[in-house]
């Protein structure tokens, strides 16, 4: 018992000694912290006293005018309007402080402000910077009234129409269409197929696109893939339908939200080919095209040119131009010989001639980049194609545009084209 009591007593003494040591250490740290804090406060106080006499308070820094000419002040002097269209009040208003309260502008003041803005833009004519036509409403009006050309991009209000970039996108597509054009004489090098077989294939694809309610761009891409593939590969007539089915499968995967499955393409070929054959042909097509699937088609240009022609969303002009452009898909000579943008422009020109008095306007010429002389050859061929549409053996497009859904435009009687 004696040793046990002694053990517990020693243990308690040791714990008390440890606690006293920790308390002393804490007090020392607190003293060091207080001393450092006092030194920081003293340093900050001294700094504020010295800075008081060396810098201007932020509240009044805008009122201090040094000897150096400020950039903003120099710019205002440069943009000062001529004396014959301004007065002293206009100059004083431009130099007022931002902190002052400005009165509401009267009609006279607004007129002077517009004159000032126009003169300011005139001073930058010699500047290397290029002003965008989308800067202001006044500049848009000046831009659209140039030579009777309408500013169609200022009418675009949808989120994805991008009026600031619409013309740049169009210019890029026109440059790209030359890169992805099929060879103009590829059908002459095919030993087992000809243009008539190609026309039958495209006519069948039109029926397939209507059966599965595919968007028009899918059909145009399918034809583009077929022509580009046949430009590099020689195909037997027994495999031509397989090429068409595989090309439409690729185009549907690229454009559609819910594309038809492989089994459906096997079904529409009446089980002529197996699913494995369709997939193998799809692989060969992608390899031959080097996976360049996003290519310009006639449909890309047609939508913009229709907008430039003031065509309403469900107008006969729109449906007739679409009908004529689809007719060119069947004709190998036209679809391969001419660029998609030229076919789109010529289709609108022929449709305008049938429905309106003016076939080609300055606005269409400005936004398409084609004048009427550039389109002469393509216009004549599309017109002849339109005249022979009713007697053509391939009637899928003719029947498609006979429906009221498309304004029955294929029933319209073609007119004689004037000599341009």
Curated annotation (Swiss-Prot):
<keyword id="KW-0131">Cell cycle</keyword>
<dbReference type="Pfam" id="PF00134">
    <property type="entry name" value="Cyclin_N"/>
</dbReference>
<dbReference type="GO" id="GO:0016538">
    <property type="term" value="F:cyclin-dependent protein serine/threonine kinase regulator activity"/>
</dbReference>
<dbReference type="InterPro" id="IPR036915">
    <property type="entry name" value="Cyclin-like_sf"/>
</dbReference>
<keyword id="KW-0195">Cyclin</keyword>
<dbReference type="Pfam" id="PF02984">
    <property type="entry name" value="Cyclin_C"/>
</dbReference>
<dbReference type="GO" id="GO:0051301">
    <property type="term" value="P:cell division"/>
</dbReference>
<dbReference type="InterPro" id="IPR013763">
    <property type="entry name" value="Cyclin-like_dom"/>
</dbReference>
<dbReference type="InterPro" id="IPR039361">
    <property type="entry name" value="Cyclin"/>
</dbReference>
<dbReference type="InterPro" id="IPR004367">
    <property type="entry name" value="Cyclin_C-dom"/>
</dbReference>
<keyword id="KW-0132">Cell division</keyword>
<dbReference type="InterPro" id="IPR048258">
    <property type="entry name" value="Cyclins_cyclin-box"/>
</dbReference>
<protein>
    <recommendedName>
        <fullName>G2/mitotic-specific cyclin-A</fullName>
    </recommendedName>
</protein>
<comment type="similarity">
    <text>Belongs to the cyclin family. Cyclin AB subfamily.</text>
</comment>
<keyword id="KW-0498">Mitosis</keyword>
<dbReference type="InterPro" id="IPR046965">
    <property type="entry name" value="Cyclin_A/B-like"/>
</dbReference>
<feature type="compositionally biased region" description="Polar residues">
    <location>
        <begin position="83"/>
        <end position="93"/>
    </location>
</feature>
<feature type="region of interest" description="Disordered">
    <location>
        <begin position="64"/>
        <end position="93"/>
    </location>
</feature>
<dbReference type="GO" id="GO:0044772">
    <property type="term" value="P:mitotic cell cycle phase transition"/>
</dbReference>
<comment type="function">
    <text>Essential for the control of the cell cycle at the G2/M (mitosis) transition. Interacts with the CDC2 and CDK2 protein kinases to form MPF. G2/M cyclins accumulate steadily during G2 and are abruptly destroyed at mitosis.</text>
</comment>
<dbReference type="InterPro" id="IPR006671">
    <property type="entry name" value="Cyclin_N"/>
</dbReference>
């Amino acid at each position: 018992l004696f040793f046990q009591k002694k053990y517990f007593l020693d243990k308690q003494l040791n714990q008390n000694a440890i606690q006293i040591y920790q308390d002393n250490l804490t007090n020392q740290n607190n003293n060091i912290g207080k001393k450092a804090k006092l030194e920081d406060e003293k340093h900050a106080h001294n700094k504020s006293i010295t800075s008081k006499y060396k810098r201007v308070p932020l509240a009044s820094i805008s009122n201090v005018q040094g000897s150096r000419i400020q950039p903003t002040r120099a710019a205002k002097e440069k943009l000062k309007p001529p004396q014959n269209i301004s007065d002293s009040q206009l100059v004083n208003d431009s130099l007022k402080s931002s902190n002052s309260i400005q009165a509401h502008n009267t009609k006279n003041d607004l007129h002077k402000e517009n004159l000032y803005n126009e003169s300011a833009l005139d001073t930058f004519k010699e500047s290397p910077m290029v002003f965008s036509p989308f800067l202001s409403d006044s500049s848009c009006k000046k831009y659209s009234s140039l030579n009777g050309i309408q500013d169609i991009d200022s009418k675009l209000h949808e989120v994805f129409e991008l009026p600031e970039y619409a013309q740049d996108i169009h210019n890029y597509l026109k440059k790209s269409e030359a890169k992805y054009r099929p060879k103009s004489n590829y059908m002459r090098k095919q030993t087992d197929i000809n243009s008539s077989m190609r026309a039958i294939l495209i006519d069948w694809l039109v029926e397939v696109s209507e059966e599965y309610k595919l968007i028009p761009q899918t059909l145009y891409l399918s034809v583009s893939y077929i022509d580009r593939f046949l430009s590099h590969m020689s195909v037997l007539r027994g495999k031509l339908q397989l090429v068409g089915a595989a090309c439409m499968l690729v185009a549907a995967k690229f454009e559609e939200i819910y594309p038809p499955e492989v089994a459906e393409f096997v079904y529409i070929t009446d089980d002529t080919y197996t699913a494995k054959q369709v997939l193998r042909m799809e692989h060969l097509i992608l390899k031959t095209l080097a996976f360049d699937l996003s290519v310009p088609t006639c449909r890309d240009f047609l939508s913009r040119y229709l907008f430039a022609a003031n065509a309403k969303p469900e107008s006969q002009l729109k449906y007739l131009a679409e009908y004529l452009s689809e007719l060119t898909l069947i004709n190998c000579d036209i679809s391969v010989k001419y660029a998609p943008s030229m076919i789109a422009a010529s289709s609108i020109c022929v449709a305008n001639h049938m429905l309106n008095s003016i076939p080609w306007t300055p606005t269409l010429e400005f936004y398409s980049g084609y004048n009427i002389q550039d389109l002469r050859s393509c216009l004549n061929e599309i017109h002849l194609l339109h005249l022979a549409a009713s007697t053509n053996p391939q009637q899928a497009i003719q029947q498609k545009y006979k429906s009221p859904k498309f304004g029955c435009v294929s029933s319209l009687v073609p007119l004689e084209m004037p000599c341009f």
